[in-house]
Amino acid sequence: MSGHSKWHNIQGRKNAQDAKRGKIFQKISRDLYQAAKAGDPDPANNAQLRLVIDKAHAANMPKKNIDRAIAKASGIGGAKFEEVTYEGYGPGGVAVMVSALTDNKNRTASAVRSAFSHSGGSLGASGSVSYMFDRKGLIEILRDDLDKSEDDMLMDALDAGAEDMKATEEKFQIFTDPSSMTDVRDALQEQGYELDTAEVTMIPQNRTEVPADKAKQYRHLIDELTENDDVADIYETGILPDEDDDEE
């Protein structure tokens, strides 16, 4: 019995790791598509695409997955993909924006609407929550083995054209105007910095603490959206309560 239980636990951890890896690959695939679509599908002529490809390699993403995502952006394969955004409120009044990449808007809209409905949330009209977010360029640099003080990093970021910087224990987060993100990225790379992230994203102006009795529903909403193959990014204002780590 104990042997079966041990195998079950190991298998459960493996399944969880596989699911996590799948979500990482999904996000990288969307980033590859967007980078290739916004610029040249040849990484030799597209610095943003090279950065995402490096991230894909670091995550051990298979080459065929990388090539497939870039091929979609190049129009190879026939399907036409569109970027669409959905807005709504999740459990506890949390504002949620969903960015999707789809070849069938009806299918995607139905799936996103169902995810909100299943969790007790509601899908809203365009503009219903987007005003609660700021569109910003975000560049992240890991602090591991980086011999830089916060003040020195801030000065380098500002000299490169950044607007602001936030430091955590793990990384420096550098914020830019969306239109200047690529210029700041290039300037930092020229200074010798290795970038972990360089993208345009949506930053919440304020955070909403999810009530403890809504935490499970909120997590279900985010999980269901994340598992949707069409969903590229999820932006939300929610903060889960600390005590919502009780069940595995």
UniProtKB/Swiss-Prot annotation:
UniProt feature coiled coil, ranges: none
Gene Ontology annotations for the cellular component aspect, listed alphabetically: cytosol
Keyword Cytoplasm: yes
A GO term, aspect molecular function: DNA binding
Location within or outside the cell: Cytoplasm
Main location: cytoplasm
Stretches for region Disordered: 1-22
Keyword annotations: Cytoplasm, DNA-binding, Transcription, Transcription regulation
Highest taxon in the source lineage: Bacteria
Protein family membership: Belongs to the TACO1 family.
HAMAP family per the UniProt record, alphabetical: Transcrip_reg_TACO1
Identification of the protein by name: Probable transcriptional regulatory protein Lreu_0552
